[in-house]
């Protein structure tokens, strides 16, 4: 039986506004890098995101309504 290493790369797809984000999206988030959105909750001036980084660590991040984010897919 042979072992196969599968390499997956992120591919930039689009720029999304904060109100276009969905649970499960992979977005670029500043110096943190590419993260997965776990949950989204509306706030007065934006949204509260729970994100997961490449080490499976979760973190809360507040974003504003007018922010834009790079959207990625795995291929």
Protein language model features and the residues they cover:
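Short, hydrophobic/aromatic-rich segments at coil-to-beta transitions
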Residues: 22-25, 47-48
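Intrinsically disordered, low-complexity, charged/polar segments
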Residues: 2-8, 58-75
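Intrinsic disorder/low-complexity segments
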Residues: 18-20, 42, 68
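Generic detector of N-terminal low-structure segments
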Residues: 14, 49, 71-74
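Mixed-charge, Lys/Arg-rich low-complexity intrinsically disordered regions
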Residues: 1-23
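Basic/aromatic-rich interaction segments and small domains that mediate binding to polyanionic partners
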Residues: 34-62
């Amino acid at each position: 039986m042979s072992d196969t290493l599968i390499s997956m790369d992120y591919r930039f797809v689009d720029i999304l506004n904060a109100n276009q984000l969905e649970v499960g999206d992979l977005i670029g988030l500043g110096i943190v890098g590419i993260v997965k959105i776990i949950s989204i909750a509306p706030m007065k001036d934006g949204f509260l995101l729970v994100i997961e980084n490449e080490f499976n660590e979760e973190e809360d991040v507040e974003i504003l309504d007018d922010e834009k984010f790079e959207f990625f897919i795995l291929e």
